[in-house]
Amino acid sequence: MKLTCMMIVAVLFLTAWTFVTAITSNGLENLFPKAHHEMKNPEASKLNKRCVPYEGPCNWLTQNCCDATCVVFWCL
């Protein structure tokens, strides 16, 4: 009985995981071309660039904020 319940939970979890990854598959499709481009041109890699955290001073020309938008020289 316990094994049957564990199998049912595992199948439900894997089914949910499949649906979640299917929704975000567009992000995965673009992963490899970007990585290939970065291998050809290491300077284009985002790992080499430093970003400014939220509410830090930024450059509005280069938009160097990590997860925000540069507004009036501040990452917001």
Swiss-Prot record:
<keyword id="KW-1218">Voltage-gated calcium channel impairing toxin</keyword>
<dbReference type="Pfam" id="PF02950">
    <property type="entry name" value="Conotoxin"/>
</dbReference>
<dbReference type="GO" id="GO:0005246">
    <property type="term" value="F:calcium channel regulator activity"/>
</dbReference>
<keyword id="KW-0528">Neurotoxin</keyword>
<feature type="disulfide bond">
    <location>
        <begin position="65"/>
        <end position="75"/>
    </location>
</feature>
<keyword id="KW-0638">Presynaptic neurotoxin</keyword>
<comment type="function">
    <text>Omega-conotoxins act at presynaptic membranes, they bind and block voltage-gated calcium channels (Cav).</text>
</comment>
<comment type="similarity">
    <text>Belongs to the conotoxin O1 superfamily.</text>
</comment>
<keyword id="KW-0800">Toxin</keyword>
<feature type="disulfide bond">
    <location>
        <begin position="51"/>
        <end position="66"/>
    </location>
</feature>
<dbReference type="InterPro" id="IPR012321">
    <property type="entry name" value="Conotoxin_omega-typ_CS"/>
</dbReference>
<keyword id="KW-0964">Secreted</keyword>
<feature type="propeptide">
    <location>
        <begin position="23"/>
        <end position="48"/>
    </location>
</feature>
<keyword id="KW-0165">Cleavage on pair of basic residues</keyword>
<dbReference type="InterPro" id="IPR004214">
    <property type="entry name" value="Conotoxin"/>
</dbReference>
<feature type="disulfide bond">
    <location>
        <begin position="58"/>
        <end position="70"/>
    </location>
</feature>
<keyword id="KW-0872">Ion channel impairing toxin</keyword>
<protein>
    <recommendedName>
        <fullName>Omega-conotoxin-like TxO5</fullName>
    </recommendedName>
</protein>
<dbReference type="GO" id="GO:0090729">
    <property type="term" value="F:toxin activity"/>
</dbReference>
<keyword id="KW-1015">Disulfide bond</keyword>
<dbReference type="GO" id="GO:0008200">
    <property type="term" value="F:ion channel inhibitor activity"/>
</dbReference>
<dbReference type="GO" id="GO:0005576">
    <property type="term" value="C:extracellular region"/>
</dbReference>
<keyword id="KW-0732">Signal</keyword>
<keyword id="KW-0960">Knottin</keyword>
<feature type="signal peptide">
    <location>
        <begin position="1"/>
        <end position="22"/>
    </location>
</feature>
<dbReference type="GO" id="GO:0044231">
    <property type="term" value="C:host cell presynaptic membrane"/>
</dbReference>
<keyword id="KW-0108">Calcium channel impairing toxin</keyword>
